[in-house]
Amino acid sequence: CRALLDAIEDGNRADGINIIALFDHEEIGSNSKQGAASIMLHDMLRRILRNMDLSENEIDESIYDAMLLSVDVAHALHPNKKEKMDITNKPVMGKGFCIKQACSQSYATDAQAIAILCQLCDEKGIPYQRFVNRSDSRGGSTLGSIAGTLLPVKTVDIGIPILAMHSA
């Protein structure tokens, strides 16, 4: 959270709105008034834009032009479970964050958002990796795909690769 706040404080934007959205109840489905499946983020964004004296059409255009960076963790290549990974996308720890994708849309990552993020990382020399769920495995999901059902914005799910994500 500190890094997110520092980024907004240190950001040098002449226009636009930066929002950090932290949701509750992620591990139990996000179906609460303060979870990612609520209309809270959508309504809050519309209220902010309405208070900027934008028309409804301008509000819609602003939302469609927005981008959501959904930040979580990612499964790193586990030395004891190599068969669980897609053979062409094996993220490892310490080599940059992962851009996460799944054909099931359990990650909300879309092509336009990937292009924007990859270009930015390439320009700034920020290392990144790709993680694609195997198509024969359900895999996880993120708040990006949940929030995206109510907020139609360009989205990319990213995460820092770790081992043993759900072990105690």
PLM regions and their residue ranges:
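Conserved alpha/beta core surface patches that mediate binding of polyanionic ligands
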Residues: 1, 6, 69, 136-144
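Alpha-helical metal-binding/catalytic segments enriched in His/Glu/Asp
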Residues: 1-29
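Generic secondary-structure signature for well-ordered alpha-helical cores
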Residues: 5-12, 46, 50-54, 118-127, ...
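Flexible, glycine/charged-enriched surface loops at secondary-structure junctions
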Residues: 11-20, 53-65, 121-135
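Short glycine-aspartate micro-motif
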Residues: 20, 68-70, 155-157
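Beta-rich nucleic-acid/ligand-interaction surfaces
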Residues: 23-34, 135-144
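A glycine- and small/hydrophobic-rich beta-loop-beta segment
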Residues: 33-96, 100
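Active-site-adjacent substrate-binding region
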Residues: 74-167
